[in-house]
């Protein structure tokens, strides 16, 4: 059986990541010009930025259960529709209240897509390519962020912040149309009794009719337990939950989204003008995309855990240097350029490690019967972390200064290194069913899923 090309399948599957990235990055430039027209003060500015995250928390909290009930495809379709409505709404918002409302709607889309897209890609991909294909989500996030920075720069002189925000509706319409032609996750179909349809999709995805072993492992995993929030806290599932929540929370508290959200302000603080600051973020966005491509190339060769540990070390060093430079050499040309270089190094190591790896691992860690809700709860924790960081950054900046803030993030990075070393298991080169069986065996659950040699998943 000739294998069909799945390039477009994975592209549209990951397009939700681009929308998340765009809406995350575009606000950093738009907020510089929005303040004057909408009359924002420090409080309402923080409200506009953080309202998306409030919606994301609500969206990711509901998405896991909804996708387990209605399917991955319908959930992505709902996210695309919300992205479109939210994008148009923020572009046309006449005042702060309406802006916050539609930012919350965008957040619902973000929460849904960040839960479902990694899960969907993970369930479609063969095991030997799962890391690379699941990393497409993070690649598209970085592409979305880069595009938002470019759009910000193009419209900066005209202060056309409404165009900056409104252009997000274009790719959301593309996703809404594209998802109509995408297959449902075969694993979800099996859990909902649509075996014949699931087999046909698997045959097309794998390019072979020899999928009996893969089907056997999916069936065995599916019939082990009923899935729900209660089952997520079963003793044998708990290590996966701890790892998922920890990775999601720590990814944000290393300070990554602080750099993304407030990169223009960071550049301004070290002496750059508004346009130069936005152009600087375009450079950071470009590095982010290029290094995520490197991650896609190496993640299935090197493994998830080594990349996380490497990333921790690199980010901690960058943050310490940033802190020392701004503490002892503030307001000098050397400090300004050293800051830019260190931000670049931080992005490089993040983009080949914690950026893609966390999104890849979240759906990998959880057993089939709680994969949707487990990924949803972990993603909820990720957005809670993002919200806390975005709200506390300006407060801490004013209270203790950027140098000590970077030192706090560095200390959290050291804790993250220890967490990965002792609490996170390697998932490279194993099928989802084999990962589940290993979790069962290590925690006295037993079961049949994945006991045989698994091929093709």
UniProtKB/Swiss-Prot annotation:
One of its GO terms (biological process) is D-glucose transmembrane transport. The gene is ywtG. Its main location: membrane. PANTHER family: D-XYLOSE-PROTON SYMPORTER-LIKE 2 (PTHR48023:SF4). One of its GO terms (molecular function) is D-glucose transmembrane transporter activity. Belongs to the major facilitator superfamily. Sugar transporter (TC 2.A.1.1) family. This is Putative metabolite transport protein YwtG. Signal peptide: none annotated. GO terms for cellular component: membrane; plasma membrane. It is a multi-pass membrane protein. The keyword Membrane applies. It is found in: Cell membrane. Disulfide bonds: none annotated. The chain crosses the membrane at residues 7-27, 38-58, 75-95, 97-117, 136-156, 163-183, 240-260, 276-296, 309-329, 340-360, 377-397, 400-420. Residues 438-457 are annotated as: Disordered. It comes from the Bacteria. Keywords: Cell membrane, Membrane, Transmembrane, Transmembrane helix, Transport. Pfam families: Sugar_tr.
């Amino acid at each position: 059986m000739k294998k069909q090309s799945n390039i477009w399948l994975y592209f549209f599957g990951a397009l939700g990541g681009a929308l998340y990235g765009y809406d995350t990055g575009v606000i950093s430039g738009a907020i510089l010009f929005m303040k004057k027209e909408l009359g924002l003060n420090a409080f309402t500015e923080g409200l506009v930025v953080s309202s998306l995250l409030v919606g994301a928390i609500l969206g990711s909290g509901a998405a896991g259960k909804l996708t387990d009930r209605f399917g991955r495809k319908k959930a992505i379709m709902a996210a695309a529709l919300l992205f479109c409505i939210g994008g148009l709404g923020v572009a046309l918002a006449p005042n702060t209240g309406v802006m916050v409302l539609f930012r919350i709607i965008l957040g619902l889309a973000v929460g849904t897509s960040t839960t479902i897209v990694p899960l969907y890609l993970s369930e479609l991909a063969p095991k030997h390519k799962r890391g690379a294909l699941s990393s497409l989500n993070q690649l598209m996030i970085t592409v979305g962020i880069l595009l938002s920075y470019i759009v910000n720069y193009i419209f900066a002189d005209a202060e056309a912040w409404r165009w900056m925000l409104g252009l997000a509706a274009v790719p959301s319409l593309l996703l809404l149309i594209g998802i109509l032609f995408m297959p449902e996750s075969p694993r979800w179909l099996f859990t909902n009794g649509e075996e014949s349809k699931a087999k046909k999709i698997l045959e097309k995805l794998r390019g072979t009719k020899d999928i009996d072993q893969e089907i056997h492992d999916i069936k065995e995993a599916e019939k082990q337990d009923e899935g729900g929030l209660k089952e997520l806290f079963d003793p044998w599932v708990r290590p996966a939950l701890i790892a998922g929540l920890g990775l999601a929370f720590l990814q944000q508290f290393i300070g990554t989204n602080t750099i993304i959200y407030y990169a223009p302000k960071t550049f301004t603080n070290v002496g750059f003008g508004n346009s130069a600051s936005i152009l600087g973020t375009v450079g950071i966005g470009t590095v982010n995309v290029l290094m995520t491509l490197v991650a896609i190339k190496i993640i299935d060769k090197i493994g998830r855990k080594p990349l996380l540990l490497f990333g921790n070390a690199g980010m901690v060093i960058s943050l310490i240097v940033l802190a020392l430079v701004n503490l002892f050499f503030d307001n000098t040309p050397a400090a300004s350029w050293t800051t830019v270089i260190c931000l670049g190094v931080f992005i490089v190591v993040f983009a080949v490690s914690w950026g893609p790896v966390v999104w890849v691992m979240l759906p990998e860690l959880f057993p089939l019967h709680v994969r949707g809700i487990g990924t949803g709860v972990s993603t909820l924790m990720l957005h809670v972390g993002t919200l806390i960081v975005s709200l506390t950054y300006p407060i801490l900046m004013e209270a203790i200064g950027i140098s000590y803030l970077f030192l706090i993030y560095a200390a959290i990075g050291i804790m993250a290194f220890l967490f990965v070393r002792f609490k996170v298991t390697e998932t490279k080169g194993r099928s989802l069913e084999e990962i589940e069986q290993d979790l069962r065996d290590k925690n006295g659950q037993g079961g049949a899923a994945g006991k045989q040699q698994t091929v093709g998943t």
